[in-house]
Amino acid sequence: MTSSPLAGQHVLVTRPAGQAEGFRTLLEAAGATVTTAPTIRLVPPSDPGVLGRAAARLDEYDWIVVTSVNAVRRLAAAAAEADSMCALATGRLAAVGPATADALRALGVADCLVPPAYRGEALAAEIVAATGAERLSDARILLVQAERARPVLRERLVGAGAGVDVAPAYAVEVNRDVRGALREFIELGLGDWLTFTASSAARAFVQLVGAQTGGALVAAISPVTAATLSGFGLPVHVVAATHSMPGLVDALVASAARPGRLAATHDHA
């Protein structure tokens, strides 16, 4: 295989500003031309005090569950302010995926639970299995996530009998500053791929320019994000088998190696 398997491919990245660089680097290393258009921006949650109060009593929780790198950053800041970094580092941690786990380990967390599939349903199942169904009714769990995140993780844990406190770490809003550039990119048919690494970015994309692709193919990081896109009427051509940014790049590379399979749908005319 060529060392630049995505050469000649123009890829749109919709991740938030300040968080797209790693994904961009991976894509460019594979030979792609990359345009970034952050469809969302991260802002403080409606009540920042919830996370601060939870961070002050981390040692009271049997599990601290974190669902994104962004949530790790904000939890760490709150824990530092509450002088509870030791409780964070020595607590029983669970992360939705390897990037989140790596961010926790960078804070000194010795180990944390990561599910084999990087989604809330799988994480809930792993926590239940690791705790034991008979002991879960006595467990207190702190769930650190985005405001208005998918409720499935909390619902599964509560349904299994756990007591769950949700601490919103940040909120997501549509980044309207990119509407003009994004519309031009789509209307001129400049892209070969539109990539989405979160359902929130997919929803914002549709709010900004509607359910149109400009002839580009659509790639999603996970079945959850793919379902969000499909729900808006956007065709999804690729879903990463491993729900991570490297996994999404791998999926694009694999598709580039089979151009005939997607040629019928990839038409800029």
What are these regions (language model features)?
Residues 1-269:
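Signature of uroporphyrinogen-III synthase
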